Amino acid sequence: MNRRRRIYEGKAKILYEGPEPGTLVQFFKDDATAFNAKKHEVIDGKGVLNNRISEHIFTQLNRIGIPTHFIRRLNMREQLIKEVEIIPLEVVVRNVAAGSLAKHLGLEEGTILPRSIIEFYYKADALDDPMVTEEHITAFGWASPQEIDDIMALAIRVNDFLTGLFLGIGIQLVDFKMECGRLWEGDMMRIVVADEISPDSARLWDITTNDKLDKDRFRRDMGGLVEAYQEVARRLGIMNENDTPRPSGPTLVK
């Protein structure tokens, strides 16, 4: 039996060597973490749901011309992706005050922001991913000014698309986190959306009830995380309406 070479393991995913040069296999784990892994639990079925939801979103992004690393889903937990050079930044786009923004600026959670706000955080778990400015990014060489412009343009386009996508299924996109990477194609390089977009990396509230359908259910000990992710999958049309939560994990539409 061939054993794949493990390239990298993060808190929620594992990257393996891909079948072709320039590709990787991204495996979604069931691990739920918060506060940079200070809180950790394994929740059966979470990885399956995140794989399918992220696949659905990245497929749509590719379709409308927003470049991503996604190629195709391989199975319930894995997807084939293009190998990129990850830029060590988390890009957060906020539409509604919640989480750290509400806390740091004394805003009531749920306050609609005057306009969408883009923030950058340096990816360093040991430092709790500190917020950084464009000056920090260029001074330390994490990205060039042109790359920052490209990242911000991608963030705005992704936010516009996701806002409309979720609004159409009765969900408010409060905020989301995305990562970007450098994709080399011969001598040419372009910035693409990488990692994942799922309820793990976005705050999603039911428009009518304000019920949280995202990882805040784990962060805040609310329970019902898999059921919330299942609800997002159902509304997106990638999960059967009559499926019910089971310890062995959810059943998804193939």
UniProtKB/Swiss-Prot annotation:
List the keywords (alphabetical).
Answer: ATP-binding, Ligase, Nucleotide-binding, Purine biosynthesis
Which GO terms label this protein's molecular function in UniProt? ATP binding; phosphoribosylaminoimidazolesuccinocarboxamide synthase activity
Under which main EC class is this enzyme filed?
Answer: ligase
GO BP field: 'de novo' IMP biosynthetic process; cobalamin biosynthetic process
Entry GO CC: cytosol
Q: Which organism is it from?
A: Brucella melitensis biotype 2 (strain ATCC 23457)
The pathway entry for this protein reads as: Purine metabolism; IMP biosynthesis via de novo pathway; 5-amino-1-(5-phospho-D-ribosyl)imidazole-4-carboxamide from 5-amino-1-(5-phospho-D-ribosyl)imidazole-4-carboxylate: step 1/2
Q: Which InterPro entries match?
A: SAICAR_synt/ADE2_N (IPR028923), SAICAR_synt_PurC (IPR033934), SAICAR_synth (IPR001636), SAICAR_synthetase (IPR050089), SAICAR_synthetase_CS (IPR018236)
Q: Which family does it belong to?
A: Belongs to the SAICAR synthetase family.
The name this protein carries in UniProt is: Phosphoribosylaminoimidazole-succinocarboxamide synthase
Q: Which HAMAP family match?
A: SAICAR_synth
Query: Could you tell me what reaction this enzyme catalyses?
Result: 5-amino-1-(5-phospho-D-ribosyl)imidazole-4-carboxylate + L-aspartate + ATP = (2S)-2-[5-amino-1-(5-phospho-beta-D-ribosyl)imidazole-4-carboxamido]succinate + ADP + phosphate + 2 H(+)
Read off the NCBIfam families from this record: purC
Pfam families referenced in this protein's UniProt entry, alphabetically: SAICAR_synt (PF01259)
Enzyme Commission identifier(s): 6.3.2.6
